[in-house]
Amino acid sequence: MALVKICGLQSLEAAETAVNNGASLVGVIMVPGRERTVKQEVAREISQMVREKRISKGSKYLDSRQLRKEWDDCPLEDWFEYNVKEINSSGPFLVGVFRNQSIDEIQQAIHTHGLDFVQLHGSEDFDSYIRNIPVPVITRYTDNAVDGLTGEDLAINRALVLLDSEQGGEGKTIDWARAQKFGERRGKYLLAGGVTPDNVAHARSHTGCIGVDVSGGVETNASKDMDKITQFIRNAT
């Protein structure tokens, strides 16, 4: 089953709607001053909710750090498929999205808000950050900035790779043909950039991605739309 991440959440209601309909990852924006930046108290409420969901289902990974401990035995060619399977079966998990913030700031946010995953969305030195972040990391790439990278480069110590349009979070549709070629040459990835309830099924079948990430595509008037969240997850999976 495809992995679904609903991102840019700013309310417990929207996060619960996502989780109750099958999203394995829910994301909050931790970058200060953005349109979708989450309030600290809301981030903590969502963190508590996803942890309680994992406890109630007897999740294998109550602490996401346990996932990293099993990577040593996973062959590179199965890396991302393995992680998707484990996340889907053991989630939901909370992802904190950061952009060019310090490692210290990220570490503090993990502790304060109980983040399960970190997503790096800027020009960070990924290898350096990953070595110093205790939870699994998702790294984001644009579809026109991956030349020269191999599947092995992308897999090492990353939980997942996110392939996005140039202007992430603004609804700009990614070039699906380039996304398909990326997957053929460099392995599996999550697809973001312009996916909506109406096109997500086609996007998945056309690109071969192993999961999808959406924010603006499930909004109405700049707010998360519960019906769109529900329909998106249904169509994606």
Swiss-Prot record:
It comes from Komagataella pastoris (Yeast). It holds the Pfam family PRAI. Its EC number is 5.3.1.24. Coiled coil: none annotated. Pathway: Amino-acid biosynthesis; L-tryptophan biosynthesis; L-tryptophan from chorismate: step 3/5. GO terms for molecular function: phosphoribosylanthranilate isomerase activity. It comes from the Eukaryota. Keywords: Amino-acid biosynthesis, Aromatic amino acid biosynthesis, Isomerase, Tryptophan biosynthesis. Belongs to the TrpF family. Gene3D superfamilies: Aldolase class I. The gene is TRP1. It catalyses: N-(5-phospho-beta-D-ribosyl)anthranilate = 1-(2-carboxyphenylamino)-1-deoxy-D-ribulose 5-phosphate. This is N-(5'-phosphoribosyl)anthranilate isomerase. It is an enzyme of class 5 (isomerase). One of its GO terms (biological process) is L-tryptophan biosynthetic process. The keyword Isomerase applies.
